[in-house]
Amino acid sequence: MKKRWLCGTMAVVIGAMAMAGGSGGNSSSSASAAGTEAADSGSSVDTSGAEMTIRVAHVCGTGSPYDYGANAFKKLVEEGSDGRIKVEVYAGDMTTDEVECVEMVQNNNLEIGWVGTGALGGFVPDLGIFELPFLFEDEDNVNKALEGEFGNSLLEQLSAVDGITGLGFHEDGWRNILTKDKTINTVDDMKGVRMRTMQNEVCVATYEALGATPVALASGEQFTGLQNGVVDGTDNSALYAVADGYIEVVNNICDIHHYYSSGIIVASSKWYEGLSEEDQKLVKESAIKAGEEQRAWFLENDEAKIAEYEEKGYTVTRPTDIDAWKEKVAPVYDKMYAAHPTWEGLVEMVRAAK
């Protein structure tokens, strides 16, 4: 799902980059040409001594969680190469969307994209598994799963797509339930609650299983939907609820972490394969490390944001009947296993990653 975070300042940058042949400015022109030349030749040219600039783009604004991760990657690559490789981060609301950002990467018009898994579901349907409720136990389970067999399996599938190389995972946040009037403390409190959801088979089935009434609304309609009573609640991390503004029209936060949203750092295969083995290793390891740093940053800052709004007078509940919630949504797993036979094995990988 596309997020808007202080967006607007970079509205036309990515489109302009594509029209200009991928140049993100004078500093990136020679680097882009060098990377493209190596890729076009189909050779394994040793670029380990060459100066270059890597452009990283995402659809969120400066200071967003995506931007934090992209800049962590920038720092790691620049320090790891002793300044030989420069990284330019393009943060802002693009005139396109995340899917088009992925297509730019795939077409070698952009080196690296920082995107959500939703933008990649059309390429790898198994990425839809992140919508399963209570898939992960906690952050430790997330880290071990993404860095182990589960994550490797998904990255391998993605890297088999023509033009795309999956480098690693980043964070899109734990989602909690935010409601305008009704306080949610137990699973029974969900009965009859009109919950905004994406038009997604897993999310719709989940809220139906919980006894709520799912209402499909676009991300940008959440504020007015809550304000006008079209829906009673929505779900997201506190950070994004604040960024998107609808934290101002809810009064309750159910800190339950029922969904975990992930993102993936994708690279242009043509560009990446044109790098030396040394530079490939640096880029890959930096992406993985940046993802780890961003996940830790996101969790800490999201919890701090919840505490901040609790101090402001918001009602914050932390349900203890998690097993009852999981029991309610168990049929969703059975339904999705029937529709997506590969998901059961992937869930087993997650469960084993402890």
Give, region by region, the residue ranges found by the protein language model.
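N-terminal secretory/targeting leader peptides
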Residues: 23-27, 42-141, 150, 159-354
